[in-house]
A protein has these predicted regions:
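Alpha-helix initiation/capping motif
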Residues: 10, 36, 95-96, 142
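C-terminal capping/extension of enzyme domains
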Residues: 6-8, 15, 62-79, 103-166
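Short, surface-exposed acidic-centric catalytic microdomains
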Residues: 2-70
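Secondary-structure boundary/capping positions in well-ordered alpha/beta enzyme cores
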Residues: 23, 88-89, 109
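Short, mixed-charge, low-aromatic patches
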Residues: 33-38, 101-109
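Internal catalytic-core helix/loop-beta-alpha segment
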Residues: 46-105
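Generic structural signal for beta-strand residues in well-ordered domains
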Residues: 42-44, 84, 122
Length: 166
């Protein structure tokens, strides 16, 4: 996988297109059922987006993409990861398993409700932690509503305005 969310059936890049580029097809390869990798990478770079998993090693206990069948064998040390990204002020989780893993690495008392955030520390860093709806089409929410949730991240006071495309 050369970039995050390459699956044609996942709506993450369509949501970004709706928020920033005037339409959900903006990051698709014209006339093809795939996302344009060059457009995606350029967009993520221009908007200061970085991606990483909360697990380095996982085991699927069943042949199913659901979090309930995912066992984290080696979690990512998110505090260490953030030490290499000093300008990062916000972290987003979408899945339940990722949120559960991040919770144990923070001083947050609970996982934020979907569509909300909390201020917490990951290691010594003060971070705004957002819990967003899954961009999978299996998650029962219209893409436009998901985009409304994600738009809040980019409108928050912590998001770097110079790189946000506004």
């Amino acid at each position: 996988m050369d970039f995050f969310y390459p699956n044609w059936l996942n709506d993450f890049w369509r949501i970004m297109g709706l928020i920033f580029l005037g339409g959900k097809q903006a990051l698709e390869a014209e006339g093809e059922k795939r996302f344009d990798q060059e457009k995606v990478i350029r967009f993520a770079t221009e908007h200061g987006l970085a991606f990483f998993d909360t697990a380095q090693k996982v085991c699927r206990t069943k042949d199913n993409a659901s979090d309930q069948f995912l066992e984290i064998q080696e979690p990512t040390d998110v505090g260490s990861l953030l030490s290499h990204i000093p300008s990062c002020t916000q972290v987003v989780t979408t899945g339940g398993k990722a949120s559960e893993e991040l919770l144990v690495q923070t001083d947050a008392g609970a996982i934020p409700a979907v569509g909300t955030c909390t201020i917490c520390h990951i290691g010594p860093r003060k971070i705004r932690w957002w819990r967003m709806p899954s961009t999978s089409r299996a998650y029962p929410m219209k893409i436009e509503r998901k985009a409304e949730h994600y738009r809040m991240i980019f409108q928050s006071e912590d998001f770097p305005k110079a790189d946000s495309g506004r």
